[in-house]
């Protein structure tokens, strides 16, 4: 009996992570779209949905048409909104650290997409981080040697990549 309960708890934890991660991705891509705008911003917004589909994450608007489980749909909705709110709050602080997080997330998505034989998604991630003004520590080193900014970008890149990795953006 304990093993079944443990398995159920593991599935619940996985469900929660997948739903929050979906919200984080939609929030990230909403920020990209807000920064870039127009056709290009709209096109790059699809990074979120492509990643959610690639990794079988849990997005309310991707489930609502095919699921009749009201409790699961409601929970997914709430957790998606929670993820979006986290990103909205984060991106109100438009500094090197936060811009590094955005880039770190996109680089983790891009590398994972490449390993899953989706190179167009990899290219889209590079386009998004450049056009949105997110900061890549290695590219930044070419342009500036401001040590404090560089350190914040490195830390942001690490945290952004780890958020995605532990949220399921991996092989």
Where are these regions (language model features)?
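Alpha-helical transmembrane segments and their helix-helix packing motifs
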Residues: 1-171
């Amino acid at each position: 009996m304990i093993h079944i309960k443990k398995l159920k708890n593991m599935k619940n934890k996985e469900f929660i992570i997948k739903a929050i991660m979906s919200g984080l991705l939609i929030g990230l891509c909403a920020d990209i779209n807000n920064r870039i705008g127009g056709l290009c911003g709209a096109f790059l917004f699809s990074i979120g949905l492509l990643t959610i589909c690639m990794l079988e994450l849990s997005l309310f608007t991707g489930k609502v048409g095919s699921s009749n489980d009201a409790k699961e749909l409601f929970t997914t909705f709430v957790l998606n909104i929670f993820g979006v709110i986290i990103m909205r709050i984060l991106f109100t602080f438009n500094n090197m650290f936060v811009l590094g997080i955005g880039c770190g997330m996109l680089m983790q998505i891009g590398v994972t997409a490449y390993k899953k034989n989706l190179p167009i998604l990899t290219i889209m991630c590079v386009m998004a981080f450049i056009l949105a003004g997110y900061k890549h520590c290695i590219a930044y080193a070419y342009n500036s040697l401001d040590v404090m900014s560089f350190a914040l970008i490195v830390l942001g890149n690490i945290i952004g990549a780890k958020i995605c990795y532990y949220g399921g953006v991996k092989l």
